[in-house]
Amino acid sequence: MEGYQRPCDEVGFNADEAHNIVKECVDGVLGGNDYNENNINQWTASIVEQSITHLVKLGKAYKYIVTCAVVQRSPYGFHTASSCFWDTTSDGTCTIRWENRTMNCIVNVFAVAIVL
């Protein structure tokens, strides 16, 4: 993968660091926009691609999975769940919730440690 660096010896997934990276990506893509059904595919693709790119640039020994859902805001709410079976000492996840007056966005990051 382009931009991949030899992993450092840090153990454990830093969810705060990943959260901040992905939040910046979401702000950059969705910030200032209103919900538009015609833009959803482009927006979600941009969010996951930018997030993966920035996470990989950290040079840590992880495989990343990033999911993104953008829905029009409604009084009915938006519910999502995920579950993982893995090594909690090295693998990790974080969820980023973003909203404005017209839409809600949920991004999940899953980081699975690469054991060499």
UniProtKB/Swiss-Prot annotation:
Annotated localization: Nucleus; Cytoplasm, Cytoskeleton; Chromosome, Centromere, Kinetochore
One cellular component term from this protein's GO annotations in UniProt: nucleus
Keyword Nucleotidyltransferase: no
Keywords: Cell cycle, Cell division, Centromere, Chromosome, Cytoplasm, Cytoskeleton, Dynein, Kinetochore, Microtubule, Mitosis, Motor protein, Nitration, Nucleus, Transport
Main localisation: nucleus
Modified residues (3'-nitrotyrosine): Y4
Highest taxon of source: Eukaryota
GO molecular function: identical protein binding
GO term, biological process aspect, one: positive regulation of mitotic cell cycle
Matches recorded under PANTHER family: DYNEIN LIGHT CHAIN TCTEX-TYPE 3 (PTHR21255:SF20), T-COMPLEX-ASSOCIATED-TESTIS-EXPRESSED 1/ DYNEIN LIGHT CHAIN (PTHR21255)
Function: Acts as one of several non-catalytic accessory components of the cytoplasmic dynein 1 complex that are thought to be involved in linking dynein to cargos and to adapter proteins that regulate dynein function. Cytoplasmic dynein 1 acts as a motor for the intracellular retrograde motility of vesicles and organelles along microtubules. Probably binds BUB3 as part of transport cargo. Required for the efficient progression through mitosis.
Family that this chain belongs to: Belongs to the dynein light chain Tctex-type family.
Subunit and partners: Homodimer. The cytoplasmic dynein 1 complex consists of two catalytic heavy chains (HCs) and a number of non-catalytic subunits presented by intermediate chains (ICs), light intermediate chains (LICs) and light chains (LCs); the composition seems to vary in respect to the IC, LIC and LC composition. The heavy chain homodimer serves as a scaffold for the probable homodimeric assembly of the respective non-catalytic subunits. The ICs and LICs bind directly to the HC dimer and the LCs assemble on the IC dimer. DYNLT1 and DYNLT3 compete for association with dynein IC (DYNC1I1 or DYNC1I2).
Entry protein name: Dynein light chain Tctex-type 3
Record organism: Mus musculus (Mouse)
